[in-house]
């Protein structure tokens, strides 16, 4: 396994610490007037998303991990797994439901998603940043429902419930930001 020293730290670099994969979020080399130099760093657990702050002596070695993101097309859910297809090799990859997690509410068949790999081990799924979807259920809007800032719940075709402006009705196509689940615009 390739190792990396604290002198080679960069934001976004992949590390394996105690059998977990992390990315470096932030780091700082500290050289106090008295005592040895050390490094203060923050890492994000790839699977859980938790951020952890640590310190270590300067020059400490860590196992490095090659993080790669590849485009896959979401095909379908077979009940237990989500099936994705590699756009280059046409290989189908089953992804367990617990690995997709909350992102499942943004997946539509044939959407292009990003799959994150750490040394060829699948670590996570990222849906497209924006999706264009249809409102399948919401309370009807009435003439004059254009008051700035007022919203109502709406169910979209993926099953997710989001807040939309009062003037939108069922059947309208909208653009949604999948990072925070917010309405962006009409399409």
What are these regions (language model features)?
Residues 2-157, 161-187:
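Acidic-enriched and Gly/Ser
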């Amino acid at each position: 396994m390739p190792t990396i020293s604290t002198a080679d730290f960069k934001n976004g670099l992949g590390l394996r610490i105690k059998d977990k994969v992390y990315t470096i979020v932030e780091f700082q080399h500290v050289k106090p007037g008295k005592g040895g130099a050390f490094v203060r760093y923050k890492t994000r657990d790839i699977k859980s998303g938790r951020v952890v702050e640590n310190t270590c002596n300067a020059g400490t070695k860590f196992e490095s991990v090659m993080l790669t993101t590849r485009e896959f097309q979401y095909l379908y859910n077979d009940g237990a797994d989500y099936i994705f297809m590699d756009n280059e090799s046409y290989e189908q990859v089953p992804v367990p439901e617990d690995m997709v997690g909350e992102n499942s509410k943004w997946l539509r068949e044939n959407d292009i998603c990003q799959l994150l790999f750490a040394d060829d081990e699948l670590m996570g799924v990222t849906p497209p940043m924006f999706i264009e979807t249809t409102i399948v259920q919401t309370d009807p809007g009435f003439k004059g429902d254009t008051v700035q800032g007022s919203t109502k719940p709406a169910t979209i075709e993926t099953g997710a419930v989001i807040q939309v402006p009062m003037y939108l009705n069922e059947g309208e196509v909208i653009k949604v930001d999948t990072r925070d689940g917010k309405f962006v615009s009409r399409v």
